[in-house]
Amino acid sequence: MENKTKKFHLASVILSVICVVFVVEAAAPVASIGNSQYFWWIFMMLLFLLPYGMIAAELGTTYVGDGGLYDWVNTAYPTTKWGARVAWYYWINFPLWMASLAVICPRLLGTMFGWNPSPFVSLLIELAFIWIVTIVAFFPVCDSIWILNLSAAVKVVLALAVGGLGVWYVTRHGFANAGGFVTYLPSFRPASLSYISVIIFNFLGFEVVCTYADNMTKPKRQIPQAIVAGGIAIAVIYLFSAFGIGAAVPTDRINTDTGLIDAVSLITGRTGGFLVGLVAFLFLITLFGNMISWSMGVNSTAAYAADRGDMPRAFSLRWEKNGMPIGAALTSGIVASVVCLAGVLMEVLAPESSLFWSFFALNLVMLLLSYIPVFPAFLRLRKTDPERERPFRVPGGQKTAAWIAYVPMVLTILSVFFTAIPLSFDRETLASFLPITIGSILAVVIGEILIRLRAGRASAKETD
């Protein structure tokens, strides 16, 4: 059911792009690479962000609807199950990501109020975060636009504040990670390469905004305008915030889950107090903004795929009041809750492990897998559907389009490999990678089983 009273204007669409794509919590893992992070940021901006943004703008304005990635791939390959795979990978990443952010919430509240919550209280906080996000997803995105706008504004303020504090720190104390020119060259150490996927993750999400098309006044104009304006703003903000963390915090002291808070603490010389508590509070707001903005896009895509028989039937359940996909939202909340409960067991068995990175890296792998078929689908749709009107078209001929598609696709495949596959077999590396490797394999296998079961049921119905 379309909401006829509320519509996005261009400014809100741009802020939605920033809210969806700019991910504050992912800055710290990248900063832990060291000075070479600046090379990787610029490299990925040119060879991934720019081509992917143009492809998303063309496909999002040509094939407007709730299906997003699934619709693009399914339209390009209608007789295959690649659309179903994309829908599954795209959806399963979300509850994993929600769980990874949920485990940060108790620490943020502890920083804000100066207390250390018990494991039981921490679990309750995590579950509260998950189900607040889940319930908000029961309502149209235009009803929550103030949350997205607030989150986008807070993200920009946080990034600029961290960057500014980094500049202030350097003028008084010098660079925390000083080094010669060689330290700014790309690092190919396995530990560094595994974090490069986070940079690509930081640039994903333009297609989520495309699923908001029904809530826009002029989607075919607003989508490409927002992607260009938002993409430029995001690139500048990322570089400035990355400089702030990298300039002021030694790489060996960067925590992958609370690195932003650690940066402010180290720069100010305080582990608590008003400023650190305020940053923790603002950080918490951005986590809600991330999940709420992504939940609406992911749930819409999952429900759209379920309506076409490519996701379990439960995902197609919609609220009669407003047509929102509550089946997908509830399933996401349940899976994220189960993951957090499993996290309690993981902490007991391996107290030194980083729950945030384990869940976040698994979410990374699944999300990146969902994007790989999009790039060849873009080229195929150019060939099989050339007469369709394209309000925005990637400039250049077919050879240019091939380069624009295959370069980011190769980078995405390499990122999945470096994130999920251990490149050495010492005990520490295996302890870090095996949960991600095993979790990724299980997620893919479960998806294939569900796809086969649905295909079997469809064949049985046709026979009857």
Predicted regions and their residues:
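C-terminal membrane-solvent junction of multi-pass transporters and transport-like membrane proteins
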Residues: 3-4, 315-323, 368-421
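TM-loop-TM module centered on a large, flexible mid-protein loop between adjacent transmembrane helices
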Residues: 71-79, 111-115, 226-292, 311-363
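Hydrophobic transmembrane alpha-helices that form the core helical bundles
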Residues: 31-32, 51-130, 135-138, 284-301, ...
